[in-house]
Structure formats: C-alpha cells, structure tokens
From Swiss-Prot:
It comes from the Bacteria. The active site is at 80 (charge relay system), 155 (charge relay system), 179 (acyl-ester intermediate). Heterotrimer of A, B and C subunits. This is Glutamyl-tRNA(Gln) amidotransferase subunit A. PROSITE patterns: AMIDASES. GO terms for biological process: translation. It comes from Mycobacteroides abscessus (strain ATCC 19977 / DSM 44196 / CCUG 20993 / CIP 104536 / JCM 13569 / NCTC 13031 / TMC 1543 / L948). Allows the formation of correctly charged Gln-tRNA(Gln) through the transamidation of misacylated Glu-tRNA(Gln) in organisms which lack glutaminyl-tRNA synthetase. The reaction takes place in the presence of glutamine and ATP through an activated gamma-phospho-Glu-tRNA(Gln).
Amino acid sequence: MTDLIRQDAAALAALIHSGEVSSVEVTRAHLDQIASTDETYRAFLHVAGEQALAAAKDVDDAIAAGSVPSGLAGVPLALKDVFTTRDMPTTCGSKILENWVPPYDATVTARLRGAGIPILGKTNMDEFAMGSSTENSAYGPTRNPWDVERVPGGSGGGSAAALAAFQAPLAIGTDTGGSIRQPAALTATVGVKPTYGTVSRFGLVACASSLDQGGPCARTVLDTALLHQVIAGHDPRDSTSVDEPVPDVVAAARAGASGDLKGVRVGVVTQLRGDGYQPGVMASFDAAVEQLTALGADVVEVSCPHFEYALPAYYLILPSEVSSNLARFDAMRYGMRVGDDGTHSAEEVMALTRAAGFGPEVKRRIMIGTYALSAGYYDAYYGRAQKVRTLIKRDLERAYEQVDVLVTPATPTTAFRLGEKVDDPLAMYQFDLCTLPLNLAGHCGMSVPSGLSADDGLPVGLQIMAPALADDRLYRVGAAYETARGALPAAL
C-alpha cells in the first residue's frame, strides 16, 4: 500500500487499466494514508470514504467489462472545498456554510465524476479563498508536510498539502491571485492556473469573479496535464467560459519531457527579482534559468513596468468583487441562520448571521471593497485600479511579442511560520507579489518545483507564464525543466 500512494497518477492509471491493481485498492490506500496522517496535517475538511470507494468500484466494474472511462479513470483525487458537491458538504472554509450540502455538482465536479475519478473528499482552504496561508480557515490551519510549524500556502493549502503528504495523487484548486501556484511552490508540487475562462466556474463559489479560475494540481507535470485535460472545456452554463479549443496540454507535456527547448524564447521579468526576495529563492531561480538555457532556450530580460502597481490594483479589485459576491449570503435561503427566534427582523437576522458566520479577513475585504465602490470613491479607487489592470495586460502582451514564456520565482520566500504574518495583513498580501499579475491579465501560469532553498531546506517554485490560450507552452517548458532538474526529495 505504501508503494501505491507514492506512485504518480499516470503510473497508477496504467496499473489500474491493465488490471494489475484495482481502483478500490488504490483508493483505499489513500484513504488509509489520510486516516493515519491528517490529524497532523489537517489537509481535509471532509473525507468521503464510502462515496470514493463506491466510485472506484464502478470504475473497476467498467474496466472488467472492457470500458475505460478516461485516461485517469480510477485514480483518486482531493477537491478544494469551494466546488459544489451534491453528496458532501461545501463550506468554503467558512462557518456561514458549515454542513451545507448543495443540491447540484459544479461542472468541474461533474467532469471528474464523468471521467471515473473517485473524489476522496474536500480540502481545507482560507475562508472563501481569501488568504495566502490557509490560516484563515474557520476550521483551523493546514500544516505543511515539509515542516509542520510552517504554512502550506493559500488559499488552497489543503490540496497542496494532501499531495505532498501522499494523501492523494491528484488535486483540484482555484487560483484568484496565486492560490494554486503559491501552495504548489511551498510544498514541492505542481500547480497550474489555466487561462481564464477555459475551466468552468459554474458551481465554483465566487470570491472575485473576474479573477477566480479552477485548475489542476499534482506531483508531476504530466499528471497535472492529464487532469487539466479532464476539467477544461467550454461550458454554456458559465457566462465567462471561453468557446475556444483547449490546447493539447498532454501532448505538450510529453514533448517537453524529451528535454529539448531549442527555439523557445524565455523572458525573465526584471521587476520580479532582487530586493525583498530570499537569497535561497533567488539562487534556485537563477539555477533554473541556467538550466533552461542549457536545454536550448533563448533567455532574455523583459520589463513589465506596471507590475509595480499590480499589488495595490489587485487589492482594490478583489475586495470590490468580494463585497458584491458575498452580499448573497443573507441567511434567507441556505447556510447559517442566527437570531431566527421571532424577535428579530429580517435585516437583524442577516446582520447577526454575517457577524457570526464570516471571519475577520472576509469582513476586512468586504469593508475595503464596499468603501472602494462607494459613491464619490469609485473612480478614485476601483476605476483607477481597472486602468492599471489594463496597463499590466498590455505589458504582458508586449512581452509576448518578444518571448514565448516568462519566468519568475513563484514566491518571494519559502514557507513562513504559522502565525508569523497573521497580524500583518500587508505582509501577507505581499506574498502574492509574483503570482497576481497573471490573474489581472487572465493569462495562464504554472509553478513547478525548482529544488530546495540553501537557506532552510524548504521547497522553492519556478513560475512559468504564457499568454491566454497558450497553456500548452507551460507544459512543454515545465516538463523539459522537470526532466532536466531530476528527482527531488519527498516531504515524507
């Protein structure tokens, strides 16, 4: 069983589809690992053992009958608790949705089920995906398997920790300003933020609608590509869904694994390096750039001057959208309901419920957003931030006229200690410095492990960025780099 949980998803799929092992065996092995380790790591908010084993048996029966539902059929997965699931709770890490079981599946959930992928359970996250450490979860923080006194990143730290702790071979996250890529960097896993609109947001509980994007996470680039292919594609139920062909990311990953990057133009973003970055992170990044050069890539410096303003623009746009989206949690139709004893008006019930149900970071962002959208301040704050967003997108478009992909460190430092930044929101926000420009532009990005920092022995991530609808470039470059880098130590 120990051997099974350490296999990558592609290898597990091959074993299951050939009949050497059953999906039930693989799923049970991962459920056993969750049972024996999650008291330490707290990666899961809900474990759906019975449902996962039933789904695994269905796959085994289909294979016995000569039918394989998909390339990943039978390989179990951990799902971030922000996607609706009709048969298990969806809490978004918040007390206001405690024990809420939605009446429908998100499109991503439905596509996973349709592909025969057993869902092991729902993973921990910062409340409503607001945070960079998973410390904002109403159900307690997730701990990093590399060092249990440190954070696994956020908001999707549960999914990344589950991968690093061998509790799951695959996971799904969401990325609003780096919530897939940043935890991947801190846990030595692979995480991809797809092009905005290429993975359906139907059934994804919204944080910031123009920024949120679901995406795949795994321990290898190929596994991530295989999962990406399952969840991507147009969805008429999502008004922001892009009706364009999805690039063949699996073929790109397989091609990249050959290690040849001749003719690929790589840009190093000048603004995302230097002061404020941990020396060990920069040393790892510089070594990764040298490796890309050795693989045949043409590496040049690229300037994106408006990245300097990305952080303040993001933290005006995001809270503004949060303020609007979270207004729907009014205690009228579902979720927590406080003060409903006949002595309070509907408005009082709403106020009492929101006061008790939302955590401090969510309240902070609602207040900032409400202020930024208020009459007299809209143009000065939200309107100006949207103009900066346009300038950042133009910076990237100009950069891609010169290069095929851009590379940066995925995070300024390695994983920080639990509690270190909780009382300093600005320091926490600055941790997203490298990742959030991509979300403002709607482009795609990947974090792939680039080794361990010489400073503290903790994981470091290389961020690869590409234009909209060029997700295949991420996989080609990421797989080539992964092959050249070689195997890394595991957290456990």
